[in-house]
Structure formats: C-alpha cells, structure tokens
Amino acid sequence: MATKIRLKRMGAKKAPFYRLVVADSRSPRDGRVVEEIGYYNPVKQPVEIKVDEEKALHWLTTGAQPSETVRALLKKAGVWQKYIAAREAK
C-alpha cells in the first residue's frame, strides 16, 4: 500500500480547516484514512499548525510520501528537519 501524508478538508463553507492524515494514495481526498497526525487552521490568526511529531516521524520513516503542502507545514512545525537529521544519521 502506497501511503501519502496529505490534507483532508474539514469545516464549513468559506471557513476551512484541514487535518493532516495518512491515507492510501488511491483513496479520495476526503475519503478513508489510516491515521490522523495533526491539523492546520489557516483561518485563525496567527495560523495554527499542530503535528504529532512521533506519529509523523514514524510514517515518514516507513515511507509515506508527504504532499508539497504538507511538506511545507512539516517544515514550519520543525518535524521535517528532525526527519532529515534522523535519515542522515543512519
């Protein structure tokens, strides 16, 4: 199963927030997910990003591919740098 870390859109019309989820790459954007690892609220000021580092690092090390947007959010949250450091330490 090819897994991706991507955003799942939630919320009302014109007031979106997103959950960072691990899903099969063939499932629809808002379809079934394997696990939720955080959320992103672009409407709130300042922008709110929460990521469960342990879960995110687990899925990244097992081969889950993040979307471009999720990769940018992981960089802002500081998780991506930890993943790169752990990968280079091996």
Swiss-Prot record:
* Family annotation (InterPro entries): Ribosomal_bS16, Ribosomal_bS16_CS, Ribosomal_bS16_dom_sf
Tell me the protein family, please: Belongs to the bacterial ribosomal protein bS16 family.
A GO-annotated cellular component:
small ribosomal subunit
Q: Tell me, what's a Pfam family for it?
A: Ribosomal_S16
| Gene designation per UniProt | rpsP
Listed PROSITE patterns = RIBOSOMAL_S16
PANTHER family tied to this protein: 30S RIBOSOMAL PROTEIN S16, SMALL RIBOSOMAL SUBUNIT PROTEIN BS16M
GO BP terms, alphabetized:
translation
Give this protein's Gene Ontology molecular function annotations: structural constituent of ribosome
Task: Please identify the protein, giving its name as recorded.
Answer: Small ribosomal subunit protein bS16
Keyword annotations:
Ribonucleoprotein, Ribosomal protein
